[in-house]
Amino acid sequence: MKYYLRWIILGALLILPACKGGDSDPPGMSGKASLSSRYEAAKAITNTAQRDQSLSVVAGDAAREGDATVVKKCIQSITASAAKDDAAFTSAVVLAKAEKGQEATEVARMITNTAQRDEALAKIAKGD
């Protein structure tokens, strides 16, 4: 069951940004301000599962924008270890593809599952 949940969350992180229509930032908000505001909103959610899912989405969006600071804050705030590891894995790979290798490595090191952490670090090292 945990295995399937990981893939569902990973799929949502990859698909959700493509589902957004139009301008993602509200009027008057820059990308970084919007990400910080979204992080604060997600962190304020009381339902743990919903909070973790929202933080995972914000982490993925922050990684796509190259904002490793927000990525790390989101990942540190996720309570479920599997969700945390999946968000860190996806974000690390996205940061690496955005040529943010050092930040990607720092995020990959946040993964607690050794096999998953090694896989992320290998992808970063190989440039995958």
Provide a role label for each language-model segment.
Residues 1-17:
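Sec-dependent bacterial lipoprotein signal peptides
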Residues 15-128:
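Non-catalytic tandem-repeat scaffold regions and their flanking low-complexity/translocation tails
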